[in-house]
Amino acid sequence: MGALTISAKYLIELGFEVQGTVDKPDIIGALFSQTEGLLGSDLDLRELQNTSRIGRIEVEVEHRGDKTVGKVYVPSNLDHYETALIAAMLETVDRVGPYNAKFQVNSIKDLRSEKRKLIIDRAKELIKLIERETIPDTKELMDKFLGEVKQGEVVSYGPEGLPAGPDVESSDTVIIVEGRADVVNLIKHGYRNVIAIEGASGGIPKTVIELSRRKTTIAFTDGDRGGEMILRELLKVADIDYIARAPPGKEVEQLTAKEIAKALRNKIPVEEYINQLSKKDRQIIEESKKQIEQAQVQPSAAPTSPQPQPESTQPTQPIQQVQVTQQTQVIEVPAQTQGQVQVTTMQQSTQQTPQLPTSVVDEINKLSGTLEAIIYDKNWTVLKRVPVRDLLDTLQQVNDAYAIVFDGVGTQRLVDAAVGKGIKMLIMTRIGNIAKVPSDMVILTFNDIINK
């Protein structure tokens, strides 16, 4: 269905069945011709459209053998009494062309109530934002009490028993801090996805290293020399995505809610932080990472005598950092047998270029500004077309999905949901905060395709 008039108050939905094969113009023509003058000139459909009190009538048609069924949508800016009269009048249409027909009202939606619901939901989100960043004077008096209460929410995580918040496992993003006191302070101010690196000897705990490989991680350290040293050790062994620092001379455990929010808001990508280091420090970090990567992919020592090898020795590809400028893997995109358009991904392939059917490219050109999403299977057949806001819920109900094209910003949460459903391609308006993506998934923007 197309876009509705912004000022419409109500939306009339009618279902219809015609005992013959007809098209949209036949349906609309019947509605106008058979209702003309029924309720007088003031409630004539054509006159109401001319004065913008009835919006553009939309029709969905489906042919089933020698019958035609579908739905009619009529946006109304009349009051609810007049809208009900118009709906009842439309039900009197009993012929379309030479065929018998039946129209019946399915629903009359109050579009303003939908808008009121959106306003209330948004207000709830804004209240949470205010409560997080604004500290009333009365709350200052209870800081000590709240701190003691919140300590009860600290859990032991991993085999090392690291101090952590209760949401570390369930959250997509994890904040890594230095000690237990830092964890307590962040939990007190509403940040429950936090873990400390203390409590384990021999350097950075393995639990933290493993978490950094499968989640988006923010290293949040003190604003002193000690915090700087811990941060560099962390970068040598862990896959950190962002860096946040306490104000100079302050420790994370001392920060107020406003200071914590500001520090996390001003976080920088790890690449930007590394570029600020001296050449020697950069080389040390890069060399440490190379050694770790080599150790992960290096096979165990070969036996002295030849051993038979299995037919396939490829390990499962690990989740890796998204690289926007280069990609060495070869990606094969299923295409229809006719009408194909070559496009180049944002990750340049060194061996072949993915292809998309022209029908998909046409849809991408039309999607901009609609806030809609289309889910395709491997044959590029449309499985679902839904509003972007319903995309995550719809994904849980769809099977055999291969690709999603949507007018929106890609997030890590969407990537994770797509991975869970075996989806291999995402095409979006813009790439947002996506830190990690499987090596067998292709991520494109509309510009990657439209500008080719």
From Swiss-Prot:
GO terms for molecular function: DNA-directed RNA polymerase activity; metal ion binding; poly(A) binding. Residues 294-320 have a biased composition (Low complexity). GO terms for biological process: DNA replication, synthesis of primer. Its cofactor is Mg(2+). Mg(2+) 2 binds at residues 222, 224. Its EC number is 2.7.7.101. Keywords: DNA replication, DNA-directed RNA polymerase, Exosome, Magnesium, Metal-binding, Nucleotidyltransferase, Primosome, Transcription, Transferase. Mg(2+) 1 binds at residues 178, 222. It catalyses: ssDNA + n NTP = ssDNA/pppN(pN)n-1 hybrid + (n-1) diphosphate. Binds two Mg(2+) per subunit. Pfam families: Toprim_4 (PF13662). Residues 289-320 are annotated as: Disordered. GO terms for cellular component: cytoplasm; DNA-directed RNA polymerase complex; exosome (RNase complex); primosome complex. Residues 172-248 form the Toprim domain. InterPro entries: DnaG_primase, Primase_DnaG_arc, TOPRIM_DnaG/twinkle, TOPRIM_dom. The keyword Plastid does not apply. PROSITE patterns: TOPRIM (PS50880). HAMAP family: DNA_primase_DnaG_arc (MF_00007). Belongs to the archaeal DnaG primase family. Forms a ternary complex with MCM helicase and DNA. Component of the archaeal exosome complex. RNA polymerase that catalyzes the synthesis of short RNA molecules used as primers for DNA polymerase during DNA replication. Also part of the exosome, which is a complex involved in RNA degradation. Acts as a poly(A)-binding protein that enhances the interaction between heteromeric, adenine-rich transcripts and the exosome. This is DNA primase DnaG. It comes from Caldivirga maquilingensis (strain ATCC 700844 / DSM 13496 / JCM 10307 / IC-167). The gene is dnaG.
